[in-house]
Structures are given as C-alpha cells and as structure tokens.
Amino acid sequence: MTDRDTPPSLEDISRRLTEAKGGADGAEADGAGSSGPARASGLGIGMRISIELVTTIAVGGAIGYGLDSWLGTSPLAMVVFLVLGGAAGVMNAYRVVKGLDDSVGLGRAIERKEKAEGNKDRA
C-alpha cells in the first residue's frame, strides 16, 4: 500500500486478517475456539479441583470447630465435619472431571449428559 489514495481490496484485507489471526480459522473449526469446558486448560481444571477440595475441608472444619465450641464436645464434631467436608470436596471434584457440573442441579446435568451420550451412540 504505497499509494494512499487507493483503498485496499477486500481480498487483501481478508488475507491480512487471516495472517494476523495466525490461521485461527482452522483451529475454530476443530472446537479449539469454542468457549466452556472444551477450552478449559488442564491447569485451570486442576486449580479448580484443588480450590474446591481445600475450601470444602476448611468449611467442614470451621463448622465442626463452631459446633465443638458451642456444644463442648472437643474434637468430635470437628473430626466428623472434616470428613464430611472431604467427602463433599471429592464429590465436587468428581463432578468437575465428569463434566456434570455445568447446569443447576446434578439430576439435570446427569440427564443432559445421558442424552448427549445417547446421541453419540446413534450417530
């Protein structure tokens, strides 16, 4: 574009956009350009799982400590709620890994996943 009076052609603009994107059009067709769980990185999923495990155990411990302080049952409630918090954390991690957490309510998510798997089997 040495001459400023002539506008660039549409083909030239399209070619330059494709070069600037780095050929991303082919990547989007593969699903890499989509949003949601398909685009989530392994590091992001790992961080989410670890945060959920830590927070559920911490919340369980806090509830147990509060109940122990209130009721005077020294380590009993804390141990019970730490175990319950750990179980809740493992259950949440399982949901994340299986992809069952993308809708409200586990039942709806399971139904949607079963429908999707049924459609894959038919194809």
UniProtKB/Swiss-Prot annotation:
- Membrane-spanning segments: 43-63, 70-90
List the top taxonomic levels of the source.
Answer: Bacteria, Pseudomonadati, Pseudomonadota, Alphaproteobacteria, Rhodospirillales
Q: What GO terms describe the biological role, i.e. biological process, of this protein?
A: proton transmembrane transport
Q: Where in the cell is it found?
A: Cell membrane
What keywords were assigned to this record? Answer: Cell membrane, CF(0), Hydrogen ion transport, Ion transport, Membrane, Transmembrane, Transmembrane helix, Transport
Keyword Cell membrane listed? The answer is: yes
**Protein name in the entry:** ATP synthase protein I
Family designation: Belongs to the bacterial AtpI family.
Give the compositionally biased regions (Basic and acidic residues). Answer: 1-19
The domain of life for this entry's organism is Bacteria
Q: How does it sit in the membrane?
A: Multi-pass membrane protein
Task: Quote the biased-composition stretches of kind Low complexity, using this chain's numbering.
Answer: 29-38
Q: Which Pfam families match?
A: ATPase_gene1
Q: Does the keyword Transport apply?
A: yes
Quote the gene name from the UniProt entry: atpI
Q: Tell me the function of this protein.
A: A possible function for this protein is to guide the assembly of the membrane sector of the ATPase enzyme complex.
Cellular component, GO annotation? plasma membrane; proton-transporting ATP synthase complex
Write down the InterPro entries for this protein, in alphabetical order.
Answer: Atp1_alphaprobac, ATPase_put
Question: Residues annotated as region Disordered?
Answer: 1-38
